[in-house]
């Protein structure tokens, strides 16, 4: 059977919070089959476990924020994206603040941590959410949509009227049957505009933001000396975010995702719309790994390879 996966050993790192600017300790621990991805605020007087789920997402203005009993963990999307890309079903994430450290602004550090810990198959079937009917959410000209598809495919379009973004491409389509998440998506960094960063700092946000963890643009150009990691890094990062946003549903999706100018809020609304219609999806497993869509029958170290 196609099995669930966790990590083999505990792994730790330290990083800076994007919004707080504080040093944050992050620990990833193996979890039993059926656990899911569980974030734990170990800095609180009484630690609070917050399982990743579509219904636990609260604030989505600047990131995907998990909330439970007054506790919150912000900026979970990059780590969730890495878990999706490496096929991790079960994991404990211990964190000493209310946000996941931003690291380099991509999912690459989290991929490295998980691969360093080692990936272990577990004696339980991997459960997929198979979309059986189209589901769509719109907000003005923005939309996000899921269609039935035997695999995992994404098409994302952005619309940033900026010379540097225009030159790199505003649309990307990826089918993970023939695309490596680790090589083609994981290293794409978050991006922002210098004038917006100043406004956020005045509001007490983005205190940890810098060119070490984001692509920063002025009105005309990219300010980072090292330029871009991918020719189309902007739209690839939006896709990286979407993969993480969708993975909070609790299982990998078998679906085609299409989006125009979507963000954390619309992605979460799409998941809630899907879950609200029980006839739009079913839970499936694969007794024969070779019967699973290409890209999911991966080896022990890579997914979507």
UniProtKB/Swiss-Prot annotation:
InterPro entries: Ribosomal_Su5_D2-typ_SF, UDP-acyl_GlcNac_deAcase, UDP-acyl_GlcNac_deAcase_C, UDP-acyl_N-AcGlcN_deAcase_N. Pathway: Glycolipid biosynthesis; lipid IV(A) biosynthesis; lipid IV(A) from (3R)-3-hydroxytetradecanoyl-[acyl-carrier-protein] and UDP-N-acetyl-alpha-D-glucosamine: step 2/6. The active site is at 264 (proton donor). Its cofactor is Zn(2+). One of its GO terms (cellular component) is membrane. Its EC number is 3.5.1.108. The keyword Metal-binding applies. GO terms for biological process: lipid A biosynthetic process. Keywords: Hydrolase, Lipid A biosynthesis, Lipid biosynthesis, Lipid metabolism, Metal-binding, Zinc. Disulfide bonds: none annotated. Zn(2+) binds at residues 78, 237, 241. Catalyzes the hydrolysis of UDP-3-O-myristoyl-N-acetylglucosamine to form UDP-3-O-myristoylglucosamine and acetate, the committed step in lipid A biosynthesis. Belongs to the LpxC family. This is UDP-3-O-acyl-N-acetylglucosamine deacetylase. The lineage of its organism: Bacteria, Pseudomonadati, Pseudomonadota, Betaproteobacteria, Burkholderiales.
């Amino acid at each position: 059977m196609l099995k669930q996966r966790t990590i083999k050993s505990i792994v730790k790192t330290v990083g800076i919070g994007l919004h707080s600017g504080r040093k944050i300790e992050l620990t990833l621990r193996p979890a039993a089959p059926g656990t899911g991805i569980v974030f734990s605020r170990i800095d609180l007087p009484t630690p609070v476990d917050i399982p990743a789920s579509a219904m636990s997402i609260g604030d989505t203005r600047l990131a995907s924020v998990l909330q439970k009993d007054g506790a919150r963990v912000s900026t979970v999307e990059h780590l969730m994206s890495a878990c999706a890309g490496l096929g991790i079903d079960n994991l404990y994430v211990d964190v000493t603040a209310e946000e996941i450290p931003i690291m380099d602004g991509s999912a690459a550090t989290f991929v490295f941590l998980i691969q360093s810990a080692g990936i272990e198959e577990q004696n339980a079937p991997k459960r997929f959410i198979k979309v059986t009917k189209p589901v769509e959410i719109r907000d003005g000209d923005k939309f996000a949509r899921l269609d039935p598809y035997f695999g995992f495919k994404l098409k994302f379009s952005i619309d940033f009227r900026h010379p540097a973004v225009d030159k790199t491409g505003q649309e990307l389509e990826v089918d993970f049957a023939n695309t490596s998440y680790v090589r083609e998506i994981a290293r794409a960094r978050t991006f922002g505009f210098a004038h917006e960063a100043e406004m956020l700092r005045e509001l007490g946000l983005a205190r940890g933001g810098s060119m070490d963890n984001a692509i920063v643009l002025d009105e005309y150009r990219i300010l980072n000396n090292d330029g871009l990691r991918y020719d189309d890094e902007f739209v690839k990062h939006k896709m990286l975010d979407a993969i993480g946003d969708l993975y909070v549903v609790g299982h990998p999706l078998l679906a085609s995702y299409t989006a125009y100018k979507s963000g954390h809020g619309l992605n979460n609304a799409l998941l809630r719309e899907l879950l609200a219609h029980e006839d739009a999806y079913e839970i499936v497993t694969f007794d024969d790994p070779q019967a699973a869509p290409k890209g999911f029958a991966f080896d022990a170290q890579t997914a979507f390879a």
